[in-house]
Structures are given as structure tokens and as C-alpha cells.
Amino acid sequence: MNFFKNILFFPISQIFRFFTSLRNFLYDSGILKPKIYKSKIISVGNLIMGGSGKTPTVEYISRYYIKKKIFFSIVSRGYKRKSRGFIIASEKDNPKSIGDEPTQYLNKFSNYSKVMVSENRNYALEYCDNNDINYVIMDDAFQNHSFNKDVDILISSYNRPFFNDHIFPMGMLREPRKNAKRADILIYSNCPYDMGTEERRNFVTKSQKYSDKKAPILFTK
């Protein structure tokens, strides 16, 4: 069954690979250039379609900023929201208007941050620059090359590590494994409490076939 499935999906995955590789090439070659903003931008994203544990990382960074008394912004696409366009979230918003994760961020961090949603993240970044919001956490932006990033964090689930996955629709990858090399930090989420040293070493070895060997690799529960 898998053999015939692979035969069917392989050509589609190659078309998907072509377009993602073309987009990356246009930015890597300088034909397209990212916009440069004053704000310090931390991007938290993944290589796969679907969840991989980004939200706890966004919340961890948020709590760090709060501890340091830094006002910041969290910018999300607002996945599954019923609205469109650029929205600065307020107490009247809910999952329908801004999405599940932004609502969660709003409920937890609204006293210390601006939560924004936009299909075009540059609208939010322009707002931050114009309103002296100097620190931005960009949720799910690993594939977005349209703006500069100071730190690019890649999240991969322990249960579905990117180094074992394949390009959609043969697998769940949005782009080739080799693009993990863009990550400044690689974090494995949902790791078991009893994950041993040898298993961690194995994950590191397999990850570094694709990631930057200088990038720290972390393991979280």
C-alpha cells in the first residue's frame, strides 16, 4: 500500500519542493530582499505542517521578557480565525476573530505586550517600528523570508523529528530537511522525561546532517 502511495505522491511532492526551493533561492540569491526593521525579531517556527510545540516556546520567551520588564509584541498569522487582515488584539477578541493561540497569548500577556495577527507580518512589524515596540516574537515564521530575523528558532517534535520526515504529501514537511540549516537554535519538543544521553546524542547526530553544526540543540518536555 505504501509503495503505491509513494508512487502517487512523489511527483506532487517534487512540485511542492520546486516551488519552496524557488522561493528560497530568490531570497538567498538577493533577487528578493527582506525588509529591515528596527525591532529585535525572534522567529519561532517549524518545518512541518501542523503543530510541533511552538506555543510553549513563545510563552517561555514572553515570560523572559516580562521578567526583564521589556514590553514586546507577539505576531501570529491567526490560524483558523474567521477574520482577515491586520488586527491588534483587544479584550473583545476571541478565537474566532484572532485564532486559538493568539487568544491564549492575549489572556496571559496582554498587560505586557501587544498581540497582533496578520497574514502579512510586515504590517505588524511596521506598526511596531512606528510605535517603539522594540522586541517582537514572530509565531510560525520559519518559512517567511520577507523580513529580517535576529534569531530563527526551529521547533521539531520528538514524536516526528524532521530528519525522518518527507516533503508533503509524502510526509508533512513544508520544505526540504536541509533548510534546517537556517535555524539559529533547534528545539525538540514533547521529549519523554526518561530520554537518555545516548538517545539525545543520536538526535543530535541525525539533526546535524541538515542543521548548522554551530546551532545549539535543546530538548524540552
Which ranges hold each PLM region?
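A transmembrane-helix-recognition feature enriched in membrane-embedded lipid enzymes
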Residues: M1-K40
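Walker A (P-loop) phosphate-binding motif
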Residues: N24-E91, Y193
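Residues at the starts of beta-strands that form the adenosine-phosphate
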Residues: I70-F72, V151, D184-I185, P216
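Phosphate/Mg2+-binding loops and adjacent switch elements
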Residues: Y79-F109, S113-S211
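Beta-strand-loop-alpha "switch" segments that mediate conformational coupling across diverse proteins
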Residues: I217-K221
